[in-house]
């Protein structure tokens, strides 16, 4: 599978970022995925000055975008689920236990945030999660799990 996101893509294509948030980010110079990955989260929180956009939220967006840029076939909702489970990059994913991670993703899927992100898509199976882990391992082996953040 191909990468679902690249560094040159507009920031609105990042997981969790819709048109309104993209406009807020663009107003502080964050126009692309590369800009998002390079953003200092604390500084971004101050510059954006919106109560719901904290440094932690920005770091979550960065981790989601990084996963979508470095793990082939990683969909936005999958990246959101993984970051909610504490997975921040391909290395974290590659070292994960599929059964444990599948349980975490399922729990998150029951939350309001999870239901918004996942929508009507079927919940990932243990096989799906194992596939994500294998793709992360392969990307690392092939040297593709690095972006110029």
Labelled PLM ranges:
Residues 1-149:
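C-terminal extensions
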